[in-house]
């Protein structure tokens, strides 16, 4: 009898340990490697990191920095990262080439009217006074397979200019001022925080806000993309990631003054530059119809070989 009671106590103890440890095991953080860029649209991601919102969702994020979305996507294909930020032009081009991608969250959308977080800049004393002076000139782009280039081409067409009359070259955002000084480019294309830095610190002049002047409506610009193969086995990772971002977006909307302080910290910028930053609209949900406007124009411009149905790229967390 005594032995029986001892066995029962041991069994009860094991059951109790399982009950107590079960939730802890279930709540163990999931881990994801995330490709990030040195740009203001990263603010919700960085905010979710700093405030522990991903951690509260049971997600451990491991960021890896890339120059641009077109560079980050190959890292996604090579499984160097699980999730990466990229513009929809690069995503659509890769999808058309056979890349099995899914969008799990949006990033930013442009405004329908200036000012906006994307500009063509020229030197303060440049003889380029308007967009109509750009034919024959060379424009620098962070990456050529980008929504920035697509938008600039649209601006040119809206002004009656053949996009082929302008030369496009790749120059990383941080190097465009030097390239301009050396004369290898006559105009820059930048987004924030480079836009504010070049205008407010270095005296460059805004020639055009290429998103609203190109598309005339608000369009989604970029967001978070994964491989379909990865998503099939990590839907919970995607859900927690999108939820952490959404909480960060809501926090930033409710605390605009805090947002500027966070940008100053995240991007190591002086207050003068941070105060001049134009912030585009954050949105975890993606306007598929707006993105389709851009992608359809790319077919006409030759940047896409045929129609890409953007809605088919969206995972439930981005709809």
Residue ranges of predicted features:
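Solvent-exposed, polar/charged alpha-helical surfaces in well-ordered, non-transmembrane soluble domains
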Residues: 51-52, 74, 78, 92, ...
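Secondary-structure end/capping motifs
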Residues: 231-305
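Short, glycine-/small- and polar/acidic-enriched structural segments
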Residues: 27-159, 167-170, 186-192, 207-208, ...
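Bacterial N-terminal signal peptides that target proteins for export
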Residues: 1-11
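Conserved C-terminal helix/tail region of periplasmic/extracytoplasmic solute-binding proteins
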Residues: 298-319
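Pocket-lining segment of extracytoplasmic ligand-binding domains
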Residues: 89, 168-169, 174-262
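Short, solvent-exposed loop/beta-turn-alpha elements that line the ligand-binding surface or hinge
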Residues: 56, 110-113, 212-217, 281-290
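Bacterial N-terminal signal peptides
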Residues: 9-21
């Amino acid at each position: 009898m005594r032995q029986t009671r001892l066995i029962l106590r041991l069994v009860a103890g094991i059951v109790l340990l399982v009950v107590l440890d079960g939730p802890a095991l279930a709540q163990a953080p999931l881990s994801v490697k995330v490709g990030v860029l040195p740009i203001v649209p990263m603010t919700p991601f960085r905010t979710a990191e700093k405030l522990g919102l991903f951690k509260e969702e049971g997600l451990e994020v491991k960021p890896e920095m890339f120059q641009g979305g077109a560079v980050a996507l190959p890292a996604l294909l090579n499984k160097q990262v699980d999730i990466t930020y990229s513009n929809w032009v690069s995503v659509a081009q890769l999808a058309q080439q056979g890349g099995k991608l899914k969008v799990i969250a949006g990033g930013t959308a442009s405004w329908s009217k200036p000012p906006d977080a994307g500009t063509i800049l020229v030197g303060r004393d440049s003889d380029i006074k308007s967009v109509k002076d750009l034919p024959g000139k060379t424009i620098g782009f962070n990456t050529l397979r980008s929504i920035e280039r697509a938008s600039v081409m649209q601006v040119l067409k809206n002004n009656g200019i053949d996009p082929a009359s302008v030369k496009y070259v790749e120059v990383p955002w941080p190097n465009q001022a030097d390239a301009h000084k050396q004369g290898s480019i006559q105009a820059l294309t930048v987004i924030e925080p480079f836009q504010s830095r070049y205008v407010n610190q270095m005296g460059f002049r805004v020639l055009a806000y290429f998103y609203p002047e190109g598309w005339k409506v608000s369009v989604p610009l970029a967001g978070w993309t994964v491989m379909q193969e990865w998503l099939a086995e990590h839907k919970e990772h995607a859900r927690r990631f999108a939820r952490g971002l959404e909480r960060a977006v809501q926090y930033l909307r409710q605390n605009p003054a805090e947002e500027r302080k966070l940008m100053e910290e995240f991007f190591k910028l002086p207050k003068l530059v941070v105060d001049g930053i134009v912030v585009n609209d954050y949105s975890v949900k993606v306007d598929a119809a707006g993105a389709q406007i851009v992608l359809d124009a790319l077919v006409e411009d030759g940047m896409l070989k045929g129609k890409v149905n953007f809605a088919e790229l969206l995972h439930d967390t981005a709809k």
